[in-house]
Each structure stands twice: as structure tokens, then as C-alpha cells.
């Protein structure tokens, strides 16, 4: 279980609040969508959970251990097991989808593999299996500059899974995608949660959150204003955003 306790973050000399005492518990295999207006703290919360940003108060507890009190090794373990997918995935556009998946992210892959691109045969087969699971087997040998935005998002997801991600934090993964591509990405996420017990926390438009997520967090002005099971929101809940 993952516990977020009183997570609070301010910015600037005037200490403008970005996150206001966020409290939540997350269970394995949940597909959580964060919704809210622009500037409500959605991306900031994701980046804090990924340890890409710090916070002033509160704690992130994973498996009973406070991450910030677990030292360098604890933080590195989390960064290996948690993947942060930005809106525009950092892929090498001159390499194939398969190579991007195999080489992985810095911090997860030995330096010699990052430089040479050399891989073991079992790694190759594992990557091909994941690409097949995500509907990308026919794109494995295509360079990433030839792929659509939705396909690139799935390549980034495959890369995270091949390198051991148990939690995926995805910042607006369907922004700019056509409806069919967006649905394909989110169906992939939902399948990973239900079949592989991967935990996914992502920022989504409200209508997509209602369709695909198993749980919805509503943020407004840095405050968690509701935490509900995935369904259509009531008008009263929408009014909180």
C-alpha cells in the first residue's frame, strides 16, 4: 500500500500553496485519474510522487517506509520501481520502438547498454512480449519518428514495464491525441491494472476519467476535494472543481 500523508508544497517568497495537505491511500492495481482545472496542482502532485519535486510538509509511505526517511537507497529503489511518463515521452526518435524499450531510462539501465545498445536475448524476447501485449508488435522495428503520439505513449509504457515499473505516473498521456488513439492508450492502462496489477496514477480530462479510471481524485487550488470510485460525477462533485 502507498500512503500520502498531509503532502504540502508552496512556491516563491510569498509561499503560494500548490498542494494543501493531500491525504490518500493507494492500493496495488488501481487506475487513478486526477482531474481538475488548470493550475490546480495535478502535475505538481505527480512530480512530487515521482520524487521529481520536493515538498515542505507531509510524507510518502511505501510498504510501511517513509520514502524521505529511507535514505538514498530507498529513494533509488522507488525511482527504479516507479516510472514517470511525461506528456511528451523522452524517446530517441532515431531508434526503433524496440531499441527504445530495451535501452530504457537512465538510472534503470547499465551505462554500457545505454552507450552501445547491446542487449541479451532474453531481454529481447521480454521486450517483444510486452510490445505485443500493448499492441505494438508490428511497430517494433519502426523508428519512433514514424509513430503516432498514441504509439509513442505506449512505447514509453512498454519501456517502463520492461524495466520493472510497478507504479506508473503519467502526466496528461492523451493530450493532443485523437479520440481513437486516446482510448487505445487508456484501454492499455486499464488492462495493465487489471491483468498485471500495475498501479497507474494519471492526469486526465474529466470525460476520459469517468470512462476508464477505477478511481477519481478531484483537485482544486491544491486541495483534494473528492476521492471517489470511477463513475460519472454528480453535478455537486463537478461544482467542486
Each model region followed by its residue ranges:
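Conserved ABC transporter NBD signature motif
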Residues: 58-69
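Catalytic Walker B motif of ABC-type/P-loop ATPase nucleotide-binding domains
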Residues: 168-171
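Conserved ABC ATPase signature
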Residues: 143-147, 151
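Helix-to-loop junction immediately C-terminal to a conserved catalytic motif
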Residues: 50
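Helix N-cap at the start of a conserved alpha-helix in ABC-type nucleotide-binding domains
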Residues: 179-181
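Conserved ABC ATPase "signature" region
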Residues: 114-139
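ABC ATPase NBD coupling module
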Residues: 67-83, 120
